Amino acid sequence: MSCPRLVIAGTSSGAGKTSLTLGLTAALRRRGLKVQTFKVGPDFLDPTWLSLASERPCINLDGWMCGERYVRDRFATATADADIAIVEGVMGLFDGADPAAAAGSTAEIARWLDAPVLLVVNAHGMARSLAALVKGYAEFDPDLHLAGVIANRCGSTRHGDWLSEALCAAGMPPLTGTVIRDSLPPLPSRHLGLVTADRQHLTSEALNTLADAVERQLDMPRILDLAEKVPATPGVAATASSTEGRPVRIGMAFDEAFHFYYPDNLQALEDAGATLVRFSPMHDDTLPADLDALLLGGGYPEEYADTLETNQTMRQAVADFAAADRPIYAECGGLMYLSEGIELRDGSRHAMTGALPFATRMLATRKRLGYAEVRHLAHGPFGPAGTCLRGHEFHYSEAIAEPAAPGWQSAWQVSYRRSNKPVAEGYQRGRLFASYVHTHFASRPGAARAFVDFCRGES
């Protein structure tokens, strides 16, 4: 890994790291650099913004789900043709899957990648206290290279000068940016976080505005110098792809309502011999021809419930596919689409495919957020009973009633990071498998190959 690189971390969520990462990415691209972006953690939303800003797929780096070997190798392969890598952190620098360890944190990823860290701090109302705060972050993990500080929401450039002097006097990393309050345009959000980025939300004009703000307020020469002073850490040899067996065509739901997929999962499926055929449950009349299986990812079906309900021919096509016991794998929003209907917060109900014998409803408060380790209770898409993967849940919906129809069973035994008691989760009958857990195939070697075999009907 000889690519210049930086990790943009925050003292907490809301420090401003996403806006600054977008602006920095846009500013670097204006300088003619190929920028490869990464996002620490399991998030699906921030990567859509970073992908638009870089015009390259943003890759999730998750220490808890994927492990060090995979993270280092994935970084090396993704940056092979890049000029610089920008890694956006998650939550605060040391926040992750374990309150007493670094697992799943930005700090863990920064150490694995030997990457310098720029710490974004909300400096509103702070002076010398900023130096004390930074000192705590700098000394909390002596193996971490905290290379610079970006003071966000400053009152003035004079305020920034004061902060810079305070850091210098305390022997702390230098101030590499003074960002004046309200100088960065706000990013739109909804209940799961940021909205999914598209050119309506992140126009070229908006990117230029962010880039201008970064160029004006960050010490770009110093930041580039920090990015280049990194060791050449060897990556891990990539695993050869395996495409034995007959070709498989997997219909993948992809539109405004369904788009929560880890790029690495999709690449792994293609490497294992699958052809992914995109279709839109919102806009297409029916399923593509000659499909072996369906992949229904997460997203925002509740936001487009009326359009999904109106597309009766597509709903019937998916219901018929399920009734024929063809392989279907659904996660979160995909589960909701397979249900009898979605009940919105206003009490209205919209019909879905009815492949699952219950409806779902939106809640005013979050149902679940966190990491999950899952285990097949019976033979499933990833192998025999007992097969384990890791994943993540984040949703505001729930099943209104558990299935009473014969033949249905729970899909997973789930162990949540914040609970010592495993629970049954998801729904399985025949070759239909639906769950609220977003799994990452890198958490189990051979998972993608097993999934493709499942779609072929060979497992």
From Swiss-Prot:
Q: Which family does it belong to?
A: Belongs to the CobB/CbiA family.
Q: What is this protein called?
A: Cobyrinate a,c-diamide synthase
Location of the active site:
C332 (nucleophile)
The pathway where this protein functions is: Cofactor biosynthesis; adenosylcobalamin biosynthesis; cob(II)yrinate a,c-diamide from sirohydrochlorin (anaerobic route): step 10/10
Alphabetical UniProt keywords: ATP-binding, Cobalamin biosynthesis, Glutamine amidotransferase, Ligase, Magnesium, Nucleotide-binding
Another remark in the UniProt entry says: The a and c carboxylates of cobyrinate are activated for nucleophilic attack via formation of a phosphorylated intermediate by ATP. CbiA catalyzes first the amidation of the c-carboxylate, and then that of the a-carboxylate.
Q: Which cofactor does it need?
A: Mg(2+)
Q: Which gene encodes it?
A: cbiA
Q: Which reaction does it catalyse?
A: cob(II)yrinate + 2 L-glutamine + 2 ATP + 2 H2O = cob(II)yrinate a,c diamide + 2 L-glutamate + 2 ADP + 2 phosphate + 2 H(+)
Cross-referenced NCBIfam families? cobB (TIGR00379), PRK01077.1 (NF002204)
